[in-house]
Amino acid sequence: MAIKRRKISVIGSGFTGATTALMVAQKELGDVVLLDIPNMEGPTKGKALDMLESTPVQGVDSTITGTSSYEDTKDSDVVVITAGIARKPGMSRDDLVATNAKIMKSVTKEVVKYSPNSYIIVLTNPADAMTYTVYKESGFPKNRVIGQSGVLDTARFRTFVAQELNVSVEDVTGFVLGGHGDDMVPLIRYSAAGGVPLTKLIAPERIEEIVERTRKGGGEIVGLLGNGSAYYAPAASLTQMVEAILKDKKRIIPTIAYLEGEYGQHDLYLGVPTILGGDGIEKVIELDLTEEEKAQLDKSVQSVRNVMAALPAE
């Protein structure tokens, strides 16, 4: 039997989706399908063709196809969902949650129909609630539905630490727990540079400033851009997750995972350290937390549950 080429479908051809498609292709993780709604078919096909025409220059042997038909995503190994709307002025959080949940359900139905054995990675905000929605709608086992936020938050934290110490980002490690943004919980005790704890290298007040900048990292970029939000780092984070699954790398990275008792939580998707490999989320890693860290995590959990409460009834 012939060996099958890997296939990755990216749902949503905006800045993040298109950049993810390009990065996945550049790493030759498989053939890529970029999909958007019918009235975006022209721009989606145009972006895909432009990317495809760059592959000979880059020495990349991945195909990239633009489409509005889910039939073209058939038998995908991994599906990345970036589709959804951003919060607009005057829009309530509940409206955002309801609108994007409706989009998630629509997308998930098609994914289940055409790629019933796929792994799904969800980026759409609010990511914890949207990942939960996809999980419930798909009926897939929990290990095959994964959310992205912690990889990005950790990358931002590592970037700022490396800048502070003037060292390589490759030597900086760290973990972020909880929800995305203001309520994330950076675990300083588990963060280091070259194996040396950050508390030995950076003054406590400066660490807190770095943590606060990390929490506001997305907003900082929104403010600088003036129109739009981050997409290079989110796309790189998604690509790392796709690679971990398709290459069975068993990376220890923070993802949004379904909890059934871990960290004292049940029936909740939350950002936690996980082992990500060929079977998706293969293990949730439970870290020992101080009372202060537990209190911070509880606050983050409550924020996530408040958002979940805005999900429309089944």
UniProtKB/Swiss-Prot annotation:
Binding site for NAD(+): 12-17, 36, 100, 123-125
The protein's enzyme class: oxidoreductase
Family membership: Belongs to the LDH/MDH superfamily. MDH type 3 family.
Catalytic residues identified in the record: 180 (proton acceptor)
Catalytic activity: (S)-malate + NAD(+) = oxaloacetate + NADH + H(+)
Keywords: NAD, Oxidoreductase, Phosphoprotein, Tricarboxylic acid cycle
Gene Ontology MF annotations: L-lactate dehydrogenase activity; L-malate dehydrogenase (NAD+) activity
List of residues that carry Phosphoserine: 149
Source organism of the structure: Shouchella clausii (strain KSM-K16) (Alkalihalobacillus clausii)
GO term, biological process aspect, one: tricarboxylic acid cycle
Gene giving rise to this polypeptide: mdh
A Pfam family that the UniProt record links to this protein: Ldh_1_C
Known EC number: 1.1.1.37
UniProt cross-references to InterPro entries, sorted A to Z: L-lactate/malate_DH, Lactate/malate_DH_C, Lactate/malate_DH_N, Lactate_DH/Glyco_Ohase_4_C, Malate_DH_type3, NAD(P)-bd_dom_sf
Record's function text: Catalyzes the reversible oxidation of malate to oxaloacetate.
Chain positions recorded as substrate binding sites: 87, 93, 125, 156
UniProt name for this protein: Malate dehydrogenase
